[in-house]
Structures are given as structure tokens and as C-alpha cells.
Regions:
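Small/polar-residue-rich segments within soluble enzyme cores
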Residues: 1-67
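Residues that form generic nucleotide/phosphate-binding pockets
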Residues: 13-14, 33-41, 85, 212-216, ...
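Carboxylate/His-rich catalytic cores and anion/metal-binding grooves
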Residues: 18-48, 89-92, 96-119, 240
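Beta-lactam-recognizing serine transpeptidase/beta-lactamase-like catalytic domain environment
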Residues: 48-65, 74, 99-147, 153-301
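Helix-start/capping segments and mature chain N-termini
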Residues: 70, 74-78, 87-91, 136
């Protein structure tokens, strides 16, 4: 506002651009991102005074112009419905105890053909007070462990690096490395070992298919109770993350909002971190990144 003036931490930068201390500027969201577009341009005038200090004439050196308008791709009615849906769902989960320790709930809807953002919705849950607050910006600033949704990208990495061929069949089985606890899929104890294709691995959400694919990126083939050499660990993680990045995971999405997070992709990691990353349990991504990932699949890349 004019009363508040320029934000103190950014005042110097704005003054260098010709702003005045009492100018009104955008401080968040799209208003901040498009400040120069929305602000317009002031007229520059030259005032001539007589020897007594009285104004004699005014010459316009530069004509001013109004700021431009921007049109959002977000559909207000749809945005409101998504907001209401999240609120209803999260309150229901709180009531039955399912969201007691949840930090909140977020949703993004994109047009996969154009990339247009149709809705960005979020609810932040304060774990200390239980308070719920709207947090749409959290869809681009907050990061989360994605879980099984990344499995399609893991299989893509297998194809891209020659580890998998087409709808390749592997054995879905309990994975046991020397000196480590078993890694299972959610159904392993009930069904034991059986052959599974790449498509079925996605359909059933197989963890062990992803582990074997990740092991293949290291140049190794799974054998029960095997010793895993880690000389190729770094290059294998680079391959996996490179494919993830092609889907927009761990990279800037290019959305026109300030302060976008590119995710949390630790530089230091162990073999266990790498293996679990193959089924979405290490690197962290924003809801917007995950939406872009799914949109990439939806529009056939």
C-alpha cells in the first residue's frame, strides 16, 4: 500500500528502477512476479520555475502508461470446488485419526496439453495447535516424499539406460541384500514370488521391481543375499535423477510464481537411500512438480 511503501528488504532495488519510497508494489504471488508488468510507467516531467520559485511551465519528457492486465488460466469455480473438496476430505481424515500427524493436503490440476494451471489448492495443518490455514502457494514451495507415484519414472530410467526392454518380466520377490533387512512390496508376504511385467509392476505398485531396476542401473543383477558393490552408485543415482528431471522432478517447473522450490535432492546419500529412491522414498518434490510429471505422461511426453 502507499501507506506501507516499498518493502524494506527490497527498497533499494526498487529505488534503482525509479520507484518512490511510497509506491505500492506487489509483495506476493502473481502480483510480485508481474510487478513491472502491472505497475505501468510513470510520466517524466520537467518543471520550469521563475526566479521567485513560481512554476512557469511543465514539459513532458516521457509519457506515462497504465500497467497491463494479466489473465489467469485458473478457473475460479473449479478452484473453489477443489478448495472445498480438500477441506472436506482433510477434516474427515482428522476426525477418524488418519491425518493426525499430517502437515496438510495439497492438489494441483493442469491441462496436460497446454500446461495451463487450472487450480492450485492447499491446506496447512499446524501439528502443535491443530489450526488449518489456506496454503495454495505451498504447492510450489513445500516439498514432500512422493512415494510410489514416481515408479513410472523409474521404469522409464530402466528403458532409457538399457536396463529394461519393453514390458520386461522380472520376478517379484522379497529382496534381501547381504546384511540388510528384506525389501518387500505390500503384497509380498501374502503371494510370495511370481513373475511380473513392467505394466503389472505399475498396476500392483511393486517395490521390488523398482529395486531390481535400480540395481540394474548399477550394472548388477539381483541374487538373493548378494553383496552389492557400490563403485557405480553415484553414476546410477545420476542416471535415475536425470530421468526424473526429464519429467520435471527435482527441477524448476518454470511456473511464473516467486520462490518456487526445486525440491529437496540431497547430495549425500547411501546405497539404501538410492534403492528406496527408486520407489519414491528419498528425494522430495513439490505438488506442482508431481503434477507436471503426471501431465508429461498424460500428453505422451
Amino acid at each position: 500500500s502507499e501507506k506501507a511503501g516499498l518493502p524494506a528488504e527490497e527498497a533499494e532495488a526498487y529505488l534503482k528502477k525509479g520507484y518512490s519510497l511510497n509506491d505500492r508494489v506487489g509483495t506476493s504471488y502473481l502480483e510480485k512476479q508481474y510487478e513491472e508488468t502491472l505497475q505501468g510507467k510513470r510520466s517524466v516531467k520537467e518543471i520550469h520555475l521563475d526566479k521567485y520559485g513560481n512554476m512557469e511551465s511543465v514539459d513532458t519528457i516521457e509519457e506515462g502508461s497504465k500497467g497491463n492486465n494479466i489473465k489467469l488460466t485458473i478457473d475460479l469455480a473449479f478452484q473453489d470446488s477443489v478448495d472445498a473438496l480438500l477441506k472436506s476430505y482433510f477434516n474427515s481424515e482428522l476426525e477418524n485419526g488418519g491425518a493426525k500427524y499430517s502437515e496438510g493436503v495439497y492438489a494441483v490440476a493442469l491441462n496436460p496439453k497446454t500446461g495451463a494451471v487450472l487450480s492450485m489448492s492447499g491446506i496447512k495443518h499446524d501439528l502443535k495447535t491443530g489450526e488449518l490455514t489456506p496454503d495454495s502457494l505451498g504447492t510450489v514451495t513445500n516439498v514432500f516424499v512422493p512415494g510410489s507415484v514416481v515408479k513410472a519414472a523409474t521404469i522409464s530410467s530402466g528403458w532409457e539406460n538399457g536396463v529394461l526392454s519393453g514390458n520386461q518380466t522380472l520376478t517379484d520377490q522379497s529382496i534381501v541384500f547381504q546384511g540388510s533387512a528384506p525389501i518387500n512390496s505390500w503384497y509380498t508376504q501374502a503371494y510370495g514370488s511370481f513373475p511380473i511385467t513392467a505394466v503389472q509392476a505399475l498396476e500392483y505398485s511393486s517395490n521390488t521391481y523398482m529395486v531390481q531396476t535400480a540395481l540394474g542401473l548399477m550394472g548388477q543383477t539381483y541374487q538373493p543375499n548378494m553383496f552389492v558393490g557400490t563403485s557405480n552408485l553415484e553414476s546410477a543415482m545420476e542416471k535415475l535423477r536425470s530421468t526424473f528431471g526429464e519429467y520435471g522432478l527435482g527441477t524448476a517447473t518454470g511456473i511464473d510464481l516467486p520462490d518456487e522450490s526445486t525440491g529437496f535432492v540431497p547430495k549425500e546419500y547411501s546405497f539404501a537411500n538410492y534403492i528406496t529412491n527408486a520407489f519414491g522414498q528419498f528425494d522430495n518434490y513439490t505438488p506442482m512438480q508431481l503434477a507436471q510429471y503426471v501431465a508429461t505422461i498424460a500428453n505422451d511426453g
